[in-house]
Amino acid sequence: MGSTGVSGSAGVSAIGDETTGPTGQSESPFVYDLRLNEGSPESYFNELATFSDEVLDQIEKQAGAILDRYIEYNELILQEMPTSRGEAAMDLLTVGAVTSIYGASAGRVPAWVLRELQKLSWKRDRPALTTGMLRDALFAAFMKVDLGRRVDVADRSPRFSMEVEQLPHLIEWLQCTIDLGESSRRLINWLSLLRTLTPSQASDWMARVQDLFDWFQTAAGEALGNYTRGVSRFLAARRPSENRRPDRFLRGKKAAEYHLAMVAAEIGNRGMRHAFRRCPRKLVIVPACMRGANARTSPGGQSAGLDVTCEGCDPSCNVNKATALLGLSEARVYLENCPRTSVRLAARWSQEPRTGVVIAACLAIMPSVQAATRSARMTCQFLPLDFPGCQSHWLRHRIPATSNESELVWLVTGSKLRRL
């Protein structure tokens, strides 16, 4: 299985120079890297498909009855758009992950700070500059990430046992983090369901979804940890100045969160595959970090607010290669500056009727993209970038990101042979 573009280590990394693992073999310098087993029978996408089946089986075994009730409540009471059973299962696993990982961090922030941050996000009676300065000051003082602890692949993040009455505070905290806000909708729905139960039953269900995540952390580390060996090095290398970065929660994700994003993308693709194939029009949206050396001068890179397409100016550009690869499929390739602005992305592309959209994005950003497109009722398939290559969040010097060309063709056309 090849990748669209070159492998791209180029001696510059998110952390430093290329490192050597305990076996003496060189390790990828990136936070995650999906190319490590490229070309082997046990490639990333095959391993992911197998593990995703295991995850769904485990959720059915541990929480099948809860899943039944969650789906029924969302569709009949909350009037949510129907989703596949697999996607609903991932909602439960996400609730377990978010409450376990971020419950303690949220609890350290006073409620008044969260209220003020939310007010400042929409306040109109102050000048924009003043509002922004006040919000930035509160954000920097209270919304901090934990620094300095090395988290190895096999290490399980300590679980925070979430009480049901603590969920509203966690939801407000998530909405203030910028990069974790996509999880708040699922927690809001989950809290609404728990409030229909007796206190003891609600506590039991809360503990059971956290138990699911406990199992997932260990199982995913064994199945997918090979692809996220760089996470622990990256987290350990962060400095105190990290807490002045607006993207600190994006950069601070644990290995288990990357694994969860991998499985969620796979399950989401399965759930929408048939609807996507029925769409008469196909689009592919790739991030600007895939552009080549001529990106700053490319006519296709000067959009002036219009949709950006490849002009074929640079034969070595990964966007050009993806465009050429899909030439016969009639799928049009467009560029987005960064899918991190997923709400804007969804607002723009959800206006395209009867259109299936393939979105390529970094795994750290993928959950936000999935949540935004799901809320916008878009028919999508999701392709993770092979590694995060942008200078804005990860690297000292940008390295053009790549994507797996076989998987891209499979998602768009269904022509690649791979186990469903």
Q: Language-model segments: which ranges?
A:
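Short His-Asn-centered micro-motif
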Residues: 263, 285-287, 334-340, 358-363
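Redox- and metal-dependent alpha/beta enzyme cores, enriched for Fe-S-associated oxidoreductases
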Residues: 272-333
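A short, acidic, amphipathic alpha-helical segment used as a generic capping/interface helix at domain edges
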Residues: 339-350, 364-368
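Proline-aspartate-enriched helix->loop->beta-strand connector
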Residues: 353-355
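Short, solvent-exposed amphipathic alpha-helical segments in soluble enzyme
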Residues: 299-305, 350-351, 373-377
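Well-ordered, non-membrane alpha-helical segments in soluble/globular domains
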Residues: 258-269, 311-320, 405-406
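C-terminal functional extensions of proteins
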Residues: 360-420
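Long, compositionally biased, glycine/small-hydrophobic-enriched stretches that function as flexible linkers
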Residues: 1-279
